[in-house]
Amino acid sequence: MAAGLEHLQELLPVAGVELGTVAAGIRYRDRPDLAIIAVTGGSTCAAVFTRNAFCAAPVIVARRHLAGNSPRFLLINAGNANAGTGIQGIVDAETCCATLAELGGVASTAILPFSTGVIGELLPVSRIQAALPQVWQVCSPTGWSSVARAIMTTDTVPKGTSVHFTCQGHPVTVTGIAKGSGMIRPDMATMLAFLATDAQVPKKVLQRCLARGVAESFNRITVDGDTSTNDACVLLATGQSEVSIATIEDPAFAALQQAVTEVCLSLAQAIVRDGEGATKFITVEVAGGRNIQECEQVAYTIAQSPLVKTACFASDPNWGRILAAIGRSGVPDLEITGVSLYLGEACVIHGGVLHPEYTEEQGRTVMAQDDITLAVELGRGDARVQIWTCDLSFAYVKINAEYRS
């Protein structure tokens, strides 16, 4: 039920990256649910992970492995989150890494594991071990779309995008894939994203690039306000192109940053459009705050309000629910006489009261659209922010009520 989400575009290969998938029977029948992303030696890697205190075992292991090594393989499974599994979960993740490391002739610390799926169940290690030799054999540079499908859980469509640009007179590619549909309010930061570029970029510079991209994309979305135990976003740089970016002051860095942010934003918005049960894509704009933090407070309070989200689902211009969300957002000393509210281009509230020219018909017209913008002006500063969310439908309840059955 993706809200205005188009079919997966053609994903461009990234020199130095090969990908493969296999049906390991982790939770799903007759569909790939295990994937690896192999990266050439000498590549660099940046990553951000969930800040959920109950982070999953693969997050713990991936952080450890990434601390002192450049990874050669990403190992990803769908259907089992390996979260809430204690020490055994960590042992299981390490065991799977060791199996792939033996196949690849690398140290187990050169493997980064990632999992998504049901929380609280032990990883079926033997099934993964049995399937790894098969996935190893089918890796290819064109496997991006296959991996995008293999890592899906409640997603209804695979998500991926590519950007190709010229820098220093040479071509550069950035390709990324992601999964996510529910339990979405990333704080990097169930959401996983994997990006790669063929530019040559030192790890610290790559980390800065990813952090900026994530801040303007994945950390600006919410489906249901729940932050997963398994959130992770990875950016690989293979150095296989002729473009080398040594510092953030390098003129080429700005071009790479723009491309990475574009890919991140496309993936993040695709996750929202594929939000569990989503029928509408909602942009919440808050301007006129004293700082970004209070703009975020207001935006997220609106975006995560069940009453606002169900009003959007019903195409009901119930602006009182939005005002209530603004009022309870916790902005200190908020003067309501400075607040204005817009549904699309229609001004509903001006100076804290109903605009005399607003009509219910205007509101219904806006709320009936597939893409809705809710805009708030606080009238107390110059800060502004955008958050993206979706509506809350009957299907969301059904999907999550039946998730483990």
UniProtKB/Swiss-Prot annotation:
One GO process term, biological-process aspect: ornithine biosynthetic process
InterPro entries linked to this entry: Arg_biosynth_ArgJ (IPR002813), ArgJ-like_dom_sf (IPR016117), ArgJ_beta_C (IPR042195)
Site (Involved in the stabilization of negative charge on the oxyanion by the formation of the oxyanion hole): 116-117
Annotated compartments: Cytoplasm
Protein's pathway: Amino-acid biosynthesis; L-arginine biosynthesis; L-ornithine and N-acetyl-L-glutamate from L-glutamate and N(2)-acetyl-L-ornithine (cyclic): step 1/1; Amino-acid biosynthesis; L-arginine biosynthesis; N(2)-acetyl-L-ornithine from L-glutamate: step 1/4
Binding-site list for substrate: 153, 179, 190, 276, 400, 405
Any one GO MF annotation of this record: glutamate N-acetyltransferase activity
Broad class of enzyme this protein falls into: transferase
Active site residues per record: 190
GO cellular component: cytoplasm
EC id: 2.3.1.35, 2.3.1.1
Keyword set, alphabetical order: Acyltransferase, Amino-acid biosynthesis, Arginine biosynthesis, Autocatalytic cleavage, Cytoplasm, Multifunctional enzyme, Transferase
UniProt entry tagged with the keyword Cell membrane: no
Swiss-Prot/TrEMBL site (Cleavage) positions: 189-190
Reactions accelerated catalytically: N(2)-acetyl-L-ornithine + L-glutamate = N-acetyl-L-glutamate + L-ornithine; L-glutamate + acetyl-CoA = N-acetyl-L-glutamate + CoA + H(+)
Recorded family membership: Belongs to the ArgJ family.
PANTHER family for the chain: ARGININE BIOSYNTHESIS BIFUNCTIONAL PROTEIN ARGJ, ARGININE BIOSYNTHESIS BIFUNCTIONAL PROTEIN ARGJ, MITOCHONDRIAL
Subunit description: Heterotetramer of two alpha and two beta chains.
Protein purpose: Catalyzes two activities which are involved in the cyclic version of arginine biosynthesis: the synthesis of N-acetylglutamate from glutamate and acetyl-CoA as the acetyl donor, and of ornithine by transacetylation between N(2)-acetylornithine and glutamate.
The protein's name: Arginine biosynthesis bifunctional protein ArgJ
